[in-house]
């Protein structure tokens, strides 16, 4: 079988499964968030936590709950890491250092899962499931809750601007969606040989004749939510390149499907919730809105996948010519198709899991996965974050389109006034500011040069790739992705602190702006579409929104990309 045919079959299979799951999964999630019925165990949980599930929150109440819950999560996870040495299942591991504990706590609570440590030798078999795996569930549920709150802003007409109850949305997202789906995925992964054990490890003899200690852990259960919740942090240092996490081509496809399932299906959830089920025309219109967003995601995802496949299938250099492709840093069991498909999916979402060494990608392939993040991770984006990210860009596209043709800027019957556009613009500007400022300061500081695996005189190949590594790190942290170019050493206090702050601001500033936007929209009355209303469903708006996404990224990041991946590719 040729590589091109293998790539085509894998992509076709992934798209076919997602197409089959799109309607039932999307509609199920809409029912979960729209249901007025609380399950018995949910009611018990609300009573224990003294939560009134029938209370609606304004945007600032909702945002306060998000920030309060996330702050408590950071403190708990930080404390758990610091004292893990005196807790059960720690083996001979001691407590985690303050800088690493801070960075890791922030990383997992923000759904980034950036890992500046070796999991096997740092985190115990208690810290992994009780601390990190729990955050894999709830951090994903937070993103989904914010997306649903924004959808309610378009749907509701409320004088007070109520957008739901965060605690109810968090509970339902965790227990009704993420937990059962993860259970099924974990069973499938177990059938493929993914390990599940609390044993500390076993010794074996390596190929060089020396004794090697092989770490064991409850991998399958954490691997499932790692991918489904677009978290990405591996329980083993090699992440999904490790045979204990991702042993077969089948498990590789399962993990890719888990990464894409919820972000893709949330566009159906959006379409279902904004349509009126009692009005056939409104229901169809809502679904067309969702399909339009999905089309934009698909165009961007497919384009970058094609670029990555072409770049990695090339034969640049002696080694690539001998191997038949750019196989450095890749697993033979996945090949170029499985590697490229995984890389584009993990950077197009906020997952950040890897089944190859991204630092070993070709300049064009590495640039493609970097661009995937710099687009704002909306192709198709993380669980929740991708949907509210592309909706914010849709508002900007409507505003720009209205200015171009003199039409009224409206979206789903809600007027886009100065307040709405300001909030949308602020949300979009957070990530570029963090990436460019963080990268600029880092490359200027002389103290950080020694941490770059690639360096040299200005303009040399080493310095160009070293710049790409720094740019990738801050793009990953600010977008809550978590993947990295491994040539950059990020264990210093500067990187631990700077990247930790980028993760915090990159996660919660957009959330605050999006929730404020939801509250502002919810307080408006709906207006009927007229002759001057720009259509927001169909091919024309798909092109406008795609162009807006690309234009925003190009204007913002082209100079930085020209200094890094583009310059490297032209050498």
Curated annotation (Swiss-Prot):
GO terms for cellular component: plasma membrane. The keyword Ion transport applies. GO terms for molecular function: P-type potassium transmembrane transporter activity; potassium ion binding. Its main location: membrane. The chain crosses the membrane at residues 5-25, 60-80, 86-106, 131-151, 177-197, 247-267, 291-311, 334-354, 386-406, 425-445, 498-518, 547-567. Keywords: Cell membrane, Ion transport, Membrane, Potassium, Potassium transport, Transmembrane, Transmembrane helix, Transport. It is a multi-pass membrane protein. Pfam families: KdpA. The keyword Zinc does not apply. It is found in: Cell membrane. Part of the high-affinity ATP-driven potassium transport (or Kdp) system, which catalyzes the hydrolysis of ATP coupled with the electrogenic transport of potassium into the cytoplasm. This subunit binds the extracellular potassium ions and delivers the ions to the membrane domain of KdpB through an intramembrane tunnel. HAMAP family: KdpA. The system is composed of three essential subunits: KdpA, KdpB and KdpC. Belongs to the KdpA family. This is Potassium-transporting ATPase potassium-binding subunit. It comes from Rhodococcus jostii (strain RHA1). The lineage of its organism: Bacteria, Bacillati, Actinomycetota, Actinomycetes, Mycobacteriales.
């Amino acid at each position: 079988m040729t590589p091109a045919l293998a790539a085509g079959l894998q992509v076709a299979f992934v798209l076919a499964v997602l197409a089959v799951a799109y309607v039932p999964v999307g509609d199920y999630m809409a029912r979960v968030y729209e249901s007025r019925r609380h399950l018995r165990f949910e009611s018990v949980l609300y009573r224990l936590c003294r939560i009134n599930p029938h209370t609606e929150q304004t945007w600032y109440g909702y945002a306060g709950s998000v920030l309060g819950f996330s702050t408590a999560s950071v403190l708990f996870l930080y404390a758990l890491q610091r004292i893990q040495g005196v807790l059960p299942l720690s083996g001979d591991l001691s407590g985690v250092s303050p800088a690493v504990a801070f960075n890791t706590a922030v990383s997992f609570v923000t759904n980034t899962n950036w890992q500046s440590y070796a999991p096997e030798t740092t985190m115990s078999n208690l810290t992994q499931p009780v601390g990190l795996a729990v955050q894999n569930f709830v951090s994903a549920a937070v993103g989904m809750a914010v997306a649903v709150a924004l959808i309610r802003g378009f749907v509701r007409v409320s004088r007070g601007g109520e957008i739901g109850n965060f605690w109810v949305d968090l509970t339902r997202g965790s227990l009704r969606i993420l937990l059962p789906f993860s259970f099924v995925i974990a069973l499938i992964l177990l059938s493929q040989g993914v390990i599940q054990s609390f044993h500390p490890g076993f010794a074996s003899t390596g190929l060089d004749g020396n004794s090697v200690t092989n770490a064991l852990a409850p991998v399958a259960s954490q691997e499932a939510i790692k991918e489904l919740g677009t978290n990405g942090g591996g329980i083993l240092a090699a992440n999904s390149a490790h045979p204990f996490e991702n042993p077969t081509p089948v498990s590789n496809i399962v993990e890719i499907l888990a990464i894409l399932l919820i972000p893709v299906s949330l566009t159906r959830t959006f379409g279902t919730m904004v349509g009126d089920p009692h009005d056939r025309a409104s229901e169809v219109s809502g679904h067309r809105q969702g399909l339009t967003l999905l089309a934009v995601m698909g165009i961007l995802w497919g384009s970058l996948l094609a670029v990555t496949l072409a770049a990695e299938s090339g034969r640049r250099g002696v080694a690539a010519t001998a191997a038949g492709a750019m196989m450095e840093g890749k697993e033979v069991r996945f090949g170029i198709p499985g590697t490229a498909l995984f890389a584009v999916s993990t950077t197009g979402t906020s997952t950040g899991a890897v089944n190859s060494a991204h630092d070993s990608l070709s300049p064009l392939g590495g640039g493609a996965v970097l661009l995937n993040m710099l687009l704002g991770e909306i192709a198709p984006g993380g669980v929740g974050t991708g949907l509210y990210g592309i909706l914010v860009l849709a508002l900007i596209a409507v505003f720009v389109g209205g200015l171009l043709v003199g039409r009224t800027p409206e979206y789903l019957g809600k007027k886009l006034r100065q307040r709405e556009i300001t909030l949308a613009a602020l949300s979009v500007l957070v990530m570029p500011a963090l990436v460019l400022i963080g990268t600029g300061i880092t490359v200027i500081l002389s103290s950080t040069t020694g941490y770059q695996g690639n360096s040299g005189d200005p303009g040399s190949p080493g310095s160009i790739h070293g710049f790409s590594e720094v740019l990738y790190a801050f793009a990953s942290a600010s977008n809550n992705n978590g993947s990295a170019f491994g040539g950059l050493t990020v264990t210093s206090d500067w990187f631990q602190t700077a990247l930790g702050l980028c993760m915090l601001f990159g996660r919660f500033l957009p959330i605050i702006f999006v929730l404020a936007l939801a509250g502002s929209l919810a307080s408006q009355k709906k207006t009927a579409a007229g002759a001057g209303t720009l259509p927001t469903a169909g091919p024309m708006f798909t092109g406008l929104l795609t162009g807006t996404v690309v234009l925003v990224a190009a204007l913002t990041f082209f100079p930085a990309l020209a200094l890094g991946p583009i310059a490297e590719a032209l050498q």
